[in-house]
Amino acid sequence: MSLDFYFSILPLLVSIFWFIAFAKHYRELDAAKRVLTIFFGVCSVLELCHALLYNVFEDHVLPVPLESLWFACTLSVYPIYYLYICRLTADSVSPRKTALILAPGILIALAFLLWPSAIIDTVRLVVNIVQVACVVVLGSRRLRAFDHRLAESYAETEDKDMRPTRNLLIVILLIAINSIVLNILGRESVITSQWLILFALDPIAVQLFLLGYIGYRRSFRVEQFLADNPEETLPDTPAENKELGAKIEQLMVTEAFYLQQNITLTDVARKVGSCRTYISSYINNELGCTFSDYVNRMRIAHAQELILRHDRSNGESKFSVIALEVGFTNEQSFYRNFRKFTGMTPNAWLEKQRHENHLS
């Protein structure tokens, strides 16, 4: 078999691999991963149509029923991925809204099945472009908003935030642009060129693999977020900012509650005897930061004291030990926050302190 054949079935193999990987654990999956399972099921059908187009039909034209199926899948994958983002960010989507999101692809596919024409194919391409733009813009907005909610709820967000998924949206956009350009060039131009087949299908295979890998590895469930942040009833008479601030400072600074691992806004609210909304509002408006930054800034300041203390006593500064002492659960979180608040790594910061102390 030629190299073209392997290039043409690579996206299909990747789609089937991830569909099986998710489907065999379907009952144990959370709502987001169940949507991702459906996504890879649709991708498998879509890439099967591609494989048949490139390798089975000599004139490289799909029969109208298969072409209609290809239309439906092409115009469904991006909306389904957007539904996955909605599930991932604790945004419930009603059945009616889901139907509206998926309707364009189904209607255009039915229209092509009944009245196959180049005009409908052009409509399909235009709708596809609009879908990609909406998924990238609206999806990125939802992911950023959820990251902010995470930073307002947890001290450490490394294993929870949406940066990998946000970065994937850029990949999706670039590959979608690639697909649109190839659509404009036409199937015949792509199919008759080995390099264009490689350019068309290999990036799609890489994208599908990354989508599956990041989705599969994600362990933080939105159900956990909802459990950690239950709906609360606001008291009729909110505490004065001065009084609330004093309670927060007593807990976090005097009692050094920030040294506890895995603390959440709910933990602080319970200790202070107030509600999360008021505490979050106080930290945002009066202290000018998120809950995560508030806690981790104190942790890094404490870590700096420990590093200098170890250095003055001629002891080796074991950053992994210090990270745990000041409340971080792992070195990765410690290093990221240290760089965030100081602009440098712990080693570079220590060398700078030694140099300044030597000069003084």
Regions found by a protein language model. Give the residues of each.
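N-terminal low-complexity or simple alpha-helical regulatory segments
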Residues: 1-115, 120-126
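Hydrophobic faces of stable alpha-helices that mediate helix-helix packing
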Residues: 10-14, 45, 79, 140, ...
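Hydrophobic cores of alpha-helical transmembrane segments in multi-pass inner/ER membrane proteins
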Residues: 11-17, 74-83, 130-141, 204-213
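Juxtamembrane transmembrane-helix termini
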Residues: 21-31, 53-60, 84-93, 138-151, ...
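Alpha-helical transmembrane segments of multi-pass integral membrane proteins
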Residues: 26-48, 70-74, 124-186, 191-207, 323
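Juxtamembrane/interfacial segments around transmembrane helices
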Residues: 59-68, 89-93, 120-131, 151-163, ...
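Membrane-proximal linker segments that couple transmembrane helices to downstream signaling/catalytic modules
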Residues: 213-332, 337-340, 347-360
